[in-house]
Amino acid sequence: MTEKKITVGIIQQQNTGDIADNKKRLKHHIEQCAAKGAQLVVLQELHNSLYFCQTESTDNFDLAESIPGESTEFYSRIAGELHIVLVTSLFERRAAGLYHNTAVVFDTDGSIAGKYRKMHIPDDPAYYEKFYFTPGDLGFTPIKTSIGTLGVLVCWDQWYPEAARLMALQGADMLIYPTAIGWESSDTPQEQKRQQDAWIISQRGHAVANGLPVVAAVSYTHLRAHETCADL
C-alpha cells in the first residue's frame, strides 16, 4: 500500500444479551463510519453477543452459526450497500462438535473475501475459550481485498509475534485484530495499567517489527458504544 491512504473505522460496542438489538446498533455504527469516509471497518471480537466465554456452559453453543449463514448474509448486505471492506468476528459452527472463533472479511461488493479461524485459544479465568473453540486450520494467510491485503488475526493471537510475522512475510499490508480483552474485576488500578501497557507495547512491537499499521477493535464490557475513524 505504498503511498496509499486508507480511512479505517473501528467499532467498539457495549453489547447486551439481545443479539438482534446488538446487530441493529452495529449496523448503525457501521453506517456512521462509512458516512465519515471509512473504506475499511473493523468490528470487535464476537460482536454479535456478550462475551460468553467468561463461563463454561453448553447453552452458549446455541449462539454458534454456520458460515455462510444468517450473520454473513446480514453483514454482506451492509458491506455491499456501503461499498466498504468489513471485518467481522463470528462463533462458527463448522460441524457437529466442531466450533471455531472465526473472522470473516467482506469486500466492497458484499462477497466474502476470506476468513481466518483463531489459532491461539486462551484458557484463563473468565477466558474459557478452549471449552468452546477448536484451534483454526487455515494457517496464517492474508486476505486479498479491493483496498489491500489484510493480515487478519484474532485477539489472543496478538501475544504471539510469529503470527504477525507470518502474515507480513506473505504480503499483508496491515495487521488487524478483532479483540475482546480486559482484566479481572478484582485487579487493582496498578495491575490494570500494567496489563494495558503490556498490551499496547505488544501491538506497537508488531507494527515496528513488521513495518505495518496495526488495527485493533477492542471489546470492554464497561465501555460505551462508539465508533472512530483514522487514516492509515
Predicted regions and their residues:
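Short beta-strand scaffold segments in enzyme catalytic cores
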Residues: 102-105, 141, 230
